[in-house]
From Swiss-Prot:
One Gene Ontology term from the biological process aspect of the record: vesicle targeting
Domain annotation Longin: ranges: 8-131
Protein name: Synaptobrevin homolog YKT6
GO molecular function annotations of the record: protein-cysteine S-palmitoyltransferase activity; SNAP receptor activity
InterPro entries: Longin-like_dom_sf, Longin_dom, R-SNARE_YKT6, V_SNARE_CC
Length: 198
């Protein structure tokens, strides 16, 4: 999972203006970096121009995903990431960056701004921080921990039953489980095996 670009733009009536951008082109060869960066800027502007105000979208281009968020006040953000990067985290990043940007940069400067004239320095740190979505986004971190716990629990149950025992045999021999619980287990087992075949 990788983020390549984080841009803040202004969607004007006649054209879209790049206000500030941060790039991570370290995974590209040295000679390709400037061209890749220019292409990301061009793509970001084009996507914002073609998007309606008040919209969010994800545009796939080969193995990359461009996530765009255009607010109703014409301020827009674009994240370019690989296709594995979680969309929810990308949109969370865009919302956070646009909120910070609108608080720090006067709205009057948006239509005529440029990367040289706009004084906002938060993009590089945000791009770096969100490279690992698990660390940056609490929900993703919790989901990853749940997935790991589920794997550990699954492995533990399998290791308990590896000695030639079957869970079905243990359930039928159990003195703790009532008749109703055993019937419920057998019914659930049949339904799950039926669905697994399909």
């Amino acid at each position: 999972m990788k983020l390549y670009s984080l841009s803040v733009l202004y969607k004007g009536e006649s054209k879209t203006v790049l206000l500030k951008a941060a790039y991570d082109v370290s995974s590209f060869s040295f000679f390709q970096r400037s061209s890749v960066q220019e292409f990301m800027t061009f793509t970001s502007q084009l996507i914002v121009e073609r998007s309606a105000k008040g919209s969010r979208a994800s545009v796939k281009e080969q193995e990359y995903l461009c996530h765009v968020y255009v607010r109703n006040d014409s301020l827009a953000g674009v994240v370019i990431a690989d296709s594995e990067y979680p969309s929810r985290v990308a949109f969370t990043l865009l919302e956070k960056v646009l909120d910070e940007f609108s608080k720090q940069v006067d709205r009057i400067d948006w239509p005529t701004g440029s990367p040289d004239t706009i004084r906002y320095s938060g993009l590089d740190s945000q791009l770096s921080r969100y490279q690992n979505p698990r660390e940056a986004d609490p929900m993703t971190k919790v989901q990853a921990e749940l997935d790991e716990t589920k794997i550990i629990l699954h492995n533990t149950m399998e290791s308990l039953l590896e000695r030639g025992e079957k869970l079905d045999d243990l359930v039928s021999k159990s003195e703790v489980l009532g008749i109703q619980s055993k019937a419920f287990y057998k019914t659930a087992r049949k339904q799950n095996s039926c669905c697994a075949i399909m």
